Amino acid sequence: MTLNISNLELTGKNIVIVEDDLPSIRYYETLLKNSGADVMIFHTGKEFIDYLAQGNKPIDLVFMDFLVPLINGIECIRILRKDRKSTPVVMITAYSSEQAKTEAYIAGCNEYVLKPIYPEKIFFLLEKYLKSSISVPHSY
């Protein structure tokens, strides 16, 4: 099966990516460019927190890097959870330690995914949290 992001009906969905690694940002942009979703990218945790403080539009899903500059991903999740308790957050990281994973879940992330994250997993997460209609092979 060939996965095609344009098969997802994400029009009107707001997806936030908090990531400082340029190749990772390009990867997300490539996967999501034809989805119809509004994708917002923040290169530092501070940019994301400043955005939250403005009380802007709803956020439907957050892809959060663990180690982003200025304010790390764990602290970003804690701050997000003060006002947006139900916004799904997927922590994406290279940190495989149980301590890091536990810390992320305690902060309030919904998923803890190790890099590299493959398109099938991203599609699965989009379907799971945004309730789209794509059929994805569920091997997770």
Give the location of each predicted region.
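Active-site beta3 strand of CheY-like receiver
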Residues: 57-63
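Two-component/phosphorelay signaling modules centered on CheY-like receiver
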Residues: 22-40
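Non-catalytic signal-transmission and effector/linker regions of two-component phosphorelay proteins
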Residues: 1-16, 120-140
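Conserved acidic carboxylate
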Residues: 19
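The feature encodes the CheY-like receiver
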Residues: 69, 97
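Short amphipathic alpha-helix used as the core "switch/output" element in two-component signaling
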Residues: 74-85
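Acidic catalytic/metal-coordinating carboxylates
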Residues: 23, 44, 72-75
